[in-house]
Amino acid sequence: MAPRPPTATPQESVTFKDVAVNFTQEEWRHVGPAQRSLYRDVMLENYSHLVSLGYQVSKPEVIFKLEQGEEPWISERELQRPFCPDWKTRPDIKSWSSQQGVSEVSHSANVWSHATFGDIWGVNTQRHQESWRRHLGPEASSQKKITALEKIAEQNKFGEDSGLSTDLVPQLDVSSSIRPSECKTFGNNLEYNSELVTQSGIPAKKKPYKCDKCRKSFIHRSSLNKHEKIHKDDAYSNGTDQGVPSGRKHHECTDCGKTFLWRTQLTEHQRIHTGEKPFECNVCGKAFRHSSSLGQHENAHTGEKPYQCSLCGKAFQRSSSLVQHQRIHTGEKPYRCNLCGRSFRHSTSLTQHEVTHSGEKPFQCKECGKAFSRCSSLVQHERTHTGEKPFECSICGRAFGQSPSLYKHMRIHKRSKPYQSNNFSIAFEPNIPLTQGESVLTDVKSYHCIDCGKDFSHITDFTEHQRIHAGENSYDSEQALRQQSLSHPREKPYQCNVCGKAFKRSTSFIEHHRIHTGEKPYECNECGEAFSRLSSLTQHERTHTGEKPYECIDCGKAFSQSSSLIQHERTHTGEKPYECNECGRAFRKKTNLHDHQRIHTGEKPYACKECGKNFSRSSALTKHHRIHSRNKL
C-alpha cells in the first residue's frame, strides 16, 4: 500500500483509546510486579509515538497516573463496561494465572508481546479490533498479519517506520479457534485464550535476543529491552550503581535544564515557562496545562466522585486524593525528613516542614518585600495592603481580613446583653446557662483548612485537625484519634500521678510532667537557655532574632507571641472574655481575673521576705519592695 500524500488525512482520527487497555481496581490487583512494569513501559511508549506521529491525542488519565507513579486502574463507571465478579474463577483464567509468576518473566513477557492485556484479562478486545479495521479500511486482510500501529506508520505522510510498540495492540487475525468465555453473572462473551501464542495463528519464531543477566531469550529486541529494565530497577532499589539507568532522560528543557524520559513530559513541562494552558473548561472557562487536570476540574461541576474508600465509604474526585486519604487508615507516612527523621503523609507537609530547618521564606510580598514560609501567610499579609476583608460578621456586618479575627469578634455578641441591629435583635435568656446560649453562635465556623476545605468553630479543633495534614498527630491515624475522643467525651483520661491534674491529650500530659521532673529538652543555640516545651523555645528565639510574626490587622502593631496579639486585639474589639462569678466584672486577661478574685477570697500569696507582709498582687509586692530599698539607702 502506497503512503498517503502529506495532505491526506486518515479516514477517522486515531484516539489513544484504540491502543489503550484499561483495568478496574479488582483486575489490577491480580497483575504481577513485572507485568505492571511492562504495562507501564508499553503504554507510555505507544502514547509517545502517537503524539510524535502528529495525532492530536490529549493526555488521558491513565497516562497521567503512570507518569506520577500512581496505580493506573480506573473506576467501573469510567470504563463503561460491565465488571465480571467471577472472572477469577474461570478455568481459563485460573489456568493462565497458575502458569504465570514473577519468576517466569520470560514466559509472561513472551505472551504479552503477542497479545493484549485485554486478551489475557478479559477486556473486550473486539471493540479494539473493530476500531482498527475502520482505520485500515477494506484493504485489511488477515493474511497480511499487519498490526494496527504498523498500519498507522504506513498511513504516515512519509511512510517511514514510526517505531511504535506493537506489544499491546491486538493482532487482526485472531484465530477462529479461540473460543469466547462466558461470564456466569452477566452472560457476556469475553474473548480469552490461555494458549494465545500457539493458537492465534502466529508462527513460531526463533528467540535470537538473549538477556546477559538471566539468559532468558526473546523474539523481539524491544521485549528484551523491557525485560532488562526489571534487572535495572532491582539493582537500583538495592542501591547499586549498575542499576542506575544511564542516558534514559534525554529530553532536556532549554529554559531550566531539567530532563525527562518522554518528549510528552517535556512538552507539558515547558508550559510552565510559556504559561500555555490549552485545555479550557466549557462551563467556567478556566484553563489548565494538562487534560487530566481539566477532567478532574470538571468533576467539581458535575459533583461526581468516582473514587471511593473501601474502608469508610468516603468518595473523592481524584484518585490521588483517595490515595492520600487511605493513609489515614493505614497510618502510612511515606514522606520522611532527611534532617530530623520525621515522617508525613503528604509531600506538601514535608515541604512546609523542611522550611523550619532551612529558614527559607520563598513567598515574598511584592509591595513591601516581607517574606513568608507559607503561601497562606503571604495571602493574609497581602490583605493589609489591599484592605480586603473577606470575613464578615453576620450579626453586625463588621468585616475582617482573617477568619480567627472574626471568631474572636463573635465572642462579643455571645457574651453581651441583647444586641440590637437594624434588621433583627439577638438575646440570650438570663435563666439559660451561658454555654447553651453560646450554642446559637457556635455554628459559625470561622477556621477554614486550606488543605481540605473543612471548617471548624473552635481553634483547638482546627489546630488538632491541621496535625492530620502535617503528620504531627500523636495517634497512629485519624481513625484512632477519633476513637480516642469518642471513648472519652469531655473526659481527661491522662492524669498526673504527682499532682493529680488531668489532661485530654497525651502531649499535654507529657509537657506537664516535665514540670515535676525538671526536664528541659529544648535548648536555645544562642544563649543555652533550656525549655520544657518546643513552643516556649520558639517564642524565646524571637528575642534574639527580633522577629514579630503576629501583626494586628487594625493598627499594624506586631508581636512575637500569638497570645500577645490576642490580648492586644481586645483593645480594638472591647472584648472581655474573663468574667468574675462573684460580682460579674469582666477582664481582658485571665491574670487580671485571678488578681481580682483574690479580693473576694482574701488570698494574699505574695509575701515580703523583709517584713513578712502579704499582698494579693505581685505588682503590689514590687511597689512595697521599694520602701525597703529606700530605707537601706
Swiss-Prot record:
Keyword vocabulary terms for this entry: DNA-binding, Isopeptide bond, Metal-binding, Nucleus, Repeat, Repressor, Transcription, Transcription regulation, Ubl conjugation, Zinc, Zinc-finger
Keyword check for Iron: no
InterPro entries given in the database record: KRAB (IPR001909), KRAB_dom_sf (IPR036051), Znf_C2H2_sf (IPR036236), Znf_C2H2_type (IPR013087)
One GO cellular component term noted in the UniProt record for this chain: nucleus
Subcellular location: Nucleus
Annotated protein name in UniProt: Zinc finger protein 90
SUPFAM superfamilies the UniProt entry points to: beta-beta-alpha zinc fingers (SSF57667), KRAB domain (Kruppel-associated box) (SSF109640)
PANTHER family on file: ZINC FINGER AND SCAN DOMAIN-CONTAINING, ZINC FINGER PROTEIN ZFP2
Family named by the database record: Belongs to the krueppel C2H2-type zinc-finger protein family.
DNA-binding recorded as keyword: yes
Zinc fingers typed C2H2-type, residue spans: 209-231, 251-273, 279-301, 307-329, 335-357, 363-385, 391-413, 447-469, 494-516, 522-544, 550-572, 578-600, 606-628
Glycyl lysine isopeptide (Lys-Gly) (interchain with G-Cter in SUMO2) cross-link, chain position(s): K445
GO biological process: one example: negative regulation of transcription by RNA polymerase II
Function text: Inhibits the transcriptional repressor activity of REST by inhibiting its binding to DNA, thereby derepressing transcription of REST target genes.
Pfam families with a match to the protein in the record: KRAB (PF01352), zf-C2H2 (PF00096)
Known partners and oligomeric status: Interacts (via N- and C-termini) with REST (via zinc-finger DNA-binding domain); the interaction inhibits REST repressor activity.
